[in-house]
A protein has these predicted regions:
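Hydrophobic alpha-helical transmembrane segments
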Residues: 1-90, 260-268, 299-309, 330-345, ...
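Terminal transmembrane helical anchor/hairpin motif
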Residues: 39-62, 193-280, 295-315, 368-395
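Secretory targeting signals
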Residues: 59-60, 67-70, 115-175, 179, ...
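Transmembrane helix boundary and interhelical loop/hinge segments in multi-pass membrane proteins
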Residues: 82-101, 113
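Membrane-interface alpha-helices at helix entry/exit sites of multi-pass transporters
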Residues: 104-116
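Central hydrophobic cores of alpha-helical transmembrane segments
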Residues: 180-191, 319, 342-354
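Internal/C-terminal transmembrane anchor helices
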Residues: 286-293, 329-369
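Function-determining sites in protein domains
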Residues: 343-350, 360-727
């Protein structure tokens, strides 16, 4: 019987009623491979890509798109194959029949696995071969494509088997369809929901919570379910560094295969019909579900009210969630509503664990917010200041040995990538600046802008934190960073691009105008870029104490690139004629070489050079501030307030007023991001001989320094409530 069960005749006979699975796989892989390939090729042709771009896109298709689409089809097919092959375990009559056959369960298990592999492999190989042939007909055939196709075959088979064995494990451990469906959903989504709950808890209870995913949280999310193991592998595969994820995928597959085989072979037939065939699993599942559910439902109630009753609602939600979820599980286990309150001792234990977890978060018993490493135990820090210094648009450039450049735009978001791709630094000034920021956050500082730090200790472990930073703290931090040579070299690495690729330089000056510089003088443009590079590297942190006096934008073209990831995280293919890169850099008064060249243009590099006729400041009143508000009732304006539709306007035209305002205003592009005033006010600067257009003259400026007292008084009289620097 053992040899007969693997015969082709028996395989054909036992596949009756399951032939729809390979038919489904054939159609699904037809859509995922050949049809998708033809659609994408049509779109590429519409966009008139060059041949080198098309080759890059076709190679990426096999490295990325086919991997994702094939994985989705493989997962769905694996689910259908597992359910179709082991569905009989939910029927006592069929269980008695199959398990009474003179065949070992292990042999029966392997027989069904072999059928499932055949259901998958035959359609897959046919459709993948068709996709290769389509590419070859379009001129894309190469040994590298064949290699990628073979690799995809192996990878998709691993993913297929992982989902297959995971589904079989669920079916083998459960005795009813309801419990099987719930357990399958839990196995594949539990870690995702748990990670979201942990992330939300950290955001609500910890002031220095880091929004990215790393360490234990990343492990829970990425390794806690078969689905996320596959997704994590796909995310890393296109980058080329997927060895670790591949080992995790294979290890998880072996674990699921072994567990499903053991669960099937040791399953007691008489337990069919029970919620869980292995009753020892009931308290384990109850703990894994009840405790997080109690905490999660408590968080929902915690977020509903806006007043001081949040804590009371939070406690109520945790109690309700713990009792409700535990009772529902007991009803499912026993299939009897009267068993809702079964296991009262267990419920009390779970409730105690929920209370301990909640108390730990609320009182920060683990010291999350107070964490700060000792200087001697610190290997270095990585800082993401994209939220503080957003005026400059920069990119990281790395020159390869063959003259090809690798381009990566500087992280503009506050995710983990902004802490992984930047240099590691260590200095006393930087350490003291971060220490001051941490102390202010410990005191409950809630206003300012958020920045992210990764501390790396000497043992190689990383700890990430997010801090709220005031304008003064940001100033100290940026000064410390500009003293770090490695940080500046990385931040302004685009200067490594060969001078021949610099095609245009544009400047923004103190009058707000945008001017093209040295349009017909390539040597002058190159000299300006070199002067700015030297000024940045040779000047330290004292440089950024002053406000910028200009911004220079460098446009490069014809760069030989291996393809790059843009600021939106999209892969951009390399092109034969080269890539384009645009950057913008602030120019400070300390940059003497750069200013010497810019003075030749005659454009204003100081507000003192502007002949201002008058300045109209528009104050936008708070809707909550009425005319009888006590805060404003005794405030008298220094100037005449002219009422507008949404506030007041004041025109300042006296010499002393204009001179005072010149010291604290700049075009919005020429302001350090960390010193912009968040005020409900805007201004229009009208130069001599220029007519006002009612706030739309194009010469918009913003506050960027010490605000004169007469402006503060008028703002208060105009009911301006938002009147702080970054705070």
């Amino acid at each position: 019987m053992k040899s007969k069960i693997y015969s082709s005749e028996y395989m054909k006979s036992s596949s009756k009623g399951q032939r729809w699975i390979p038919a489904f796989a054939m159609i699904a892989f037809l859509l995922a491979f050949p049809v998708a390939e033809l659609i994408l090729m049509g779109k590429w042709n519409e966009r008139s890509y060059t041949q080198s771009q098309l080759s890059y896109l076709y190679s990426s298709l096999w490295s990325s798109d086919f991997l994702t689409m094939g994985a989705a089809v493989a997962a769905v097919t694996a689910f259908f194959a597992a359910v179709s092959g082991f569905w009989y375990l939910y029927s006592p009559r069929k269980v008695d029949f199959y398990h009474s056959l003179p065949v070992k369960r292990s042999v029966l298990f392997l027989h069904r696995v072999l059928l499932a592999v055949l259901y998958y492999l035959v359609p897959y190989v046919i459709m993948e071969f068709a996709a290769v042939c389509i590419g070859a007909a379009r001129g894309y055939y190469s040994l590298s494509i064949m290699k990628k196709a073979l690799i995809l075959l192996v990878l998709h088979l691993l993913m297929y088997l992982l989902v297959y064995f995971s589904t079989v494990l669920v079916i083998a451990c459960t005795g009813t369809m309801l419990m099987g469906a719930l357990a399958w959903a839990g196995l594949f989504t539990y870690s995702i929901v748990l990670a979201v709950m942990l992330q939300l808890s950290g955001h609500l209870f910890f002031d220095t919570w880091y929004e990215g995913s790393y360490g234990i949280l990343a492990a829970v999310r990425n390794l806690g379910s078969p689905l996320m193991v596959i997704v994590s592998f796909i995310d890393r595969y296109s980058s080329g560094s997927f060895g670790k994820q591949l080992l995790i995928l294979i290890l998880t597959l072996f674990i699921m295969a072994a567990l499903s085989w053991m669960a099937f072979c040791r399953r007691r037939s008489e337990n069919t019909g029970k919620a869980l065939v292995y009753t020892w699993m009931e308290p384990v599942l109850s703990a894994l579900i009840t405790i997080p559910s109690g905490l999660g439902i408590g968080l929902i109630f915690y977020m509903i009210p806006e007043d001081s009753s949040k804590t009371a609602w939070w406690i109520f939600g945790m109690i309700l969630g713990t009792i409700l979820v535990h009772g529902i599980l007991e009803v499912i286990y026993e299939m009897d509503f009267r068993r809702f309150f079964r296991g009262k001792v267990q419920l009390m234990i779970f409730g105690g664990v929920v209370a301990i977890c909640a108390l730990t978060m609320k009182m920060d018993l683990l010291g999350y917010d107070s964490y700060f490493p000792a200087y001697d135990n610190l290997q270095g820090v990585v800082i993401n200041v994209s939220n503080l210094s957003y005026a400059e648009q920069l990119c990281n450039v790395e020159k390869k040995e063959d003259g090809i450049y690798k381009i990566r735009y500087t992280a503009t978001s506050d995710n983990s990538s902004g802490l992984l791709d930047q240099p590691v630094m260590k200095s006393k000034a930087l350490y003291n600046s971060l220490k001051d920021i941490r102390l202010q956050n410990e005191k409950g500082k809630k206003s300012g802008r958020r920045m992210y730090v990764r501390y790396i200790n000497k043992q190689g472990f990383s700890v990430c934190r997010g801090y709220i930073v005031s304008s003064a703290q940001a100033q100290n931090l940026m000064e410390a960073l500009y003293d770090e040579q490695t940080w500046k070299e990385d931040r302004y690495s685009f200067f490594q691009l060969d001078k021949q690729y610099l095609k245009e330089v544009t400047g923004i000056f103190c009058d707000g105008d945008i001017q093209t510089l040295f349009e017909k003088n390539a040597e002058k443009r190159q000299a300006l870029a070199e002067a700015l590079r030297k000024d940045i590297l040779e000047n330290g942190g004292q440089t950024v104490k002053d406000q910028p006096c200009a911004m220079l934008m460098f446009d490069y073209a014809g760069i030989p690139s291996e393809g790059y990831m843009d600021e939106w995280g999209m892969n951009v293919p390399a092109v034969q004629e080269g890539e384009r890169v645009s950057t913008s850099v602030l120019v400070y008064p300390a940059y003497k070489r750069t200013l010497a060249i810019l003075k030749e243009t005659g454009y204003p590099l100081s507000m003192d050079k502007l002949s201002v006729e008058y300045i109209d400041v528009y104050y936008f009143s708070s809707e909550a501030a009425g005319e009888d508000d006590e805060v404003f009732s005794d405030t008298e304006p220094i100037s005449d307030l002219e009422e507008t539709d949404n506030g007041y306007k004041v025109r300042y035209d006296k010499k002393e007023q204009l001179e005072a305002l010149k010291k604290c205003i700049r075009p919005s592009q020429l302001v350090n991001g960390w010193t912009i005033w968040n005020a409900d006010a805007t201004m229009e600067v009208v130069l001599e001989g220029q007519e006002s257009t009612g706030g739309d003259s194009g010469l918009y400026m913003t506050f960027a320094g010490e605000i004169p007292d007469f402006i503060k008084a008028d703002a208060k009289a105009a009911h301006v409530t938002e009147w702080e620097v970054n705070d």
